[in-house]
Amino acid sequence: SGKILLNKERIDLINYLQEHVLSRDDIYFDETQIENYIAFSEKWYFPLDNWEKFIAPFIFLYFKEDDELFYEEFFITLGRGGGKNGFISTLSNYFISPLHGINNYDVSVVANSEDQAKVSFKEVFNTIDGNPKLEGSFDAWKAQIVGKGTNSVFKFQTSNAKTKDGGREGCVIYDETHEYEDRQIIDVFSGGLGKVANPREFFIGTNGFVRAGFYDKLEERSKAILSGENLNDRMFPFICKLDDPEEVKNEAMWEKANPAFEKPLSPRSKRLLNKVRKQYEALKNNPSGREAFMTKRMNLPEVDLEKVVAPWKDILATNREMPELQNRACIGA
């Protein structure tokens, strides 16, 4: 039928874009960049999913006045297996290519572990390595990939803020943002942005088990943007999740959390759906796995009430400023 199921946050995003972005007359889409990115990705990597083609134009949205980016930050969260890393692989390779055309536009992908940071890097490396046409435009080494025409470098980094200094990146991609307890590492890398034209940051991940961390703060920002409460915050929030835990019982609802399940299914999506279906069926004999399944596959953390003293929203409600204690007496026993 051509129809897709959307969760509330994506419906809100479409309404927000129609009301507050697409109605503006001081911005423009760079159609050449959009078409070049899609053509580059589909020639050397894979057909882009509809959700990737939906986001892509907003990556190349500019102000008419000075050709600066309208969106410099993107928050992309969906159920595990949806293709987030593939998307950032294509973007990273395109950004260092002559088609993008910005000299010294370095790209770093940052994650908590080296293995995760290397996921997209390896995909780009393997795509270039042994391909004579791509090897003519890129030097692929084990630690970095260089776009010859623009002298732009793509590399992976781990998120140990104590050992990092902000570089001169054009783009930083923060993977597995659900594991970040605070924004310390973001502050390190974002400090190097802006020295090169068109600075971009991508926050990628699926929900996790760290509460009140950086991921939750991104969700709070997204809510304020989509509600119209903070229209000055130009972050693009693309959030895919179930609206209600009960929806997990209806497999047709799963595409709310993972757009890879939109019809028609690609061969890769069919394999993924079969895997997720088996995991869901296994919960009948292993109910303790439900919390992880809901968090990672449905992108909707579900609290196990048997393990929790107080619900998280009740804990947050107790937050209050500490009183001034200086020069007050301290009594101990």
In which residue ranges do the predicted regions lie?
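Phosphate/NTP-binding elements of NTP-utilizing enzymes
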Residues: 1-333
